[in-house]
């Protein structure tokens, strides 16, 4: 059985990309154009790095659903005037909070695994947002990423 994660990568904490994979190291190399197969949306830059990943979601279909909700945290298929609040790392974290607030997990082992760099960025820019995220999900800080 393959273990899938939903991940967010960032370029300089402005541009973000959310996806799923069962082989993150390979997928990141694809996004950074080291090997073929990266998403069209990430080809503009070649220095993407992990911000966080969500683990513990039971199966691929549930991870796909979670990813869809990360792309549409307000539940709407089309972008509207409220979509801009979900831009950048802080916007994606805010969207993650909304998804976690509304999305019902059958598995309570869902965790947010965040890089130390991303953690420090959020604490500097918006400590309250980190505390809000912490109220919805257990967060592990990844020291060596």
What are these regions (language model features)?
Residues 1-65, 94-145:
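GIY-YIG nuclease catalytic motif and its immediate N-terminal context
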Residues 35-42, 68-90, 94:
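Short arginine-rich
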């Amino acid at each position: 059985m393959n273990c899938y994660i939903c991940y967010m990568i960032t370029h300089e904490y402005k541009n973000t990309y959310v996806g799923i994979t069962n082989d993150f190291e390979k997928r990141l190399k694809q996004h950074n154009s080291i090997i073929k197969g990266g998403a069209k949306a990430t080809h503009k830059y070649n220095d993407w790095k992990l911000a966080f990943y969500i683990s513990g979601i039971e199966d691929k279909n549930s991870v796909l659903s979670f990813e869809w909700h990360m792309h549409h945290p307000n539940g709407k298929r089309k972008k509207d005037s409220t979509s801009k609040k979900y831009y950048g790392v802080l916007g994606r974290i805010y969207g993650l909070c909304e998804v976690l607030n509304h999305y019902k997990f059958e598995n309570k082992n869902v965790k947010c695994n965040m890089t130390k760099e991303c953690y420090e960025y959020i604490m500097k820019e918006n400590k309250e947002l980190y505390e809000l995220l912490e109220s919805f999900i257990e967060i592990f800080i990844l020291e060596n990423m």
